């Protein structure tokens, strides 16, 4: 099964954890602030390269703008500054020189 909250590396402190991992696939789920994107992506890189060789690829899951709009209209949730699929799609190319591990991005939509 899936392991919850596995460390990026056995030698790293508690703050360096994935949300889930199974075999050599790491998963990050991010509905929070957009500023977490860089940190989340670097965790994939650290676990794949940097002499760790613990994963083959990462999966990054977030909401879409449409889902955020729906949740705002239905429940009044404030998404100001939050990450979404479209932001990941926009900023991911800027990380391509630093991130060599494949990352599959999933946007949860309505």
Enumerate the language-model features and the residues they cover.
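Active-site metal-binding core of divalent-cation-utilizing nuclease and nuclease-like domains
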Residues: 1-23, 35-42, 49
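Cysteine-centric segments in proteins
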Residues: 6-11, 58-64
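Short, flexible loop/turn elements at secondary-structure junctions
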Residues: 24, 31-33, 109
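Short beta-strand-loop-alpha-helix junction that forms the active-site gateway
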Residues: 28-39, 65
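Arginine/glycine-rich "motif VI" loop of SF2 helicases in the C-terminal RecA-like domain
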Residues: 47-54, 94-98
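Conserved acidic-Pro-Pro-aromatic motif
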Residues: 50-56, 62-65, 70
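Domain-level recognition of nuclease-like catalytic cores that cleave nucleotide substrates
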Residues: 64-110
